[in-house]
Amino acid sequence: MSVTNVSNETNATKAVFDPPVGITAPPIDELLDKVTSKYALVIFAAKRARQINSFYHQADEGVFEFIGPLVTPQPGEKPLSIALREINAGLLDHEEG
């Protein structure tokens, strides 16, 4: 009885995926450097995302109560992702209280 060693070293092709977006871009570690806690980041980003969302809704009506995105939005990008990119870029100041 003979045993043959077969090597599994074949040229495996690696799957190519789009990089994840949203909370992973910008990285959470970079965002946490901008605020005092992860809870402050959540509140800060949520408030700004609501402002951006309201801006889009009011722009259709011709009312401009809120300021629109301070970064160039990507096609189909959600308000929360825009807000996180603004925070990471240092374009916003916030007060905790």
From Swiss-Prot:
The keyword Ion transport does not apply. It comes from the Bacteria. InterPro entries: DNA-dir_RNA_pol_omega, Pol_omega/Rpo6/RPB6, RPB6/omega-like_sf. Keywords: DNA-directed RNA polymerase, Nucleotidyltransferase, Transcription, Transferase. GO terms for cellular component: DNA-directed RNA polymerase complex. Its EC number is 2.7.7.6. GO terms for molecular function: DNA binding; DNA-directed RNA polymerase activity. Belongs to the RNA polymerase subunit omega family. HAMAP family: RNApol_bact_RpoZ (MF_00366). PANTHER family: DNA-DIRECTED RNA POLYMERASE SUBUNIT OMEGA. This is DNA-directed RNA polymerase subunit omega. The gene is rpoZ.
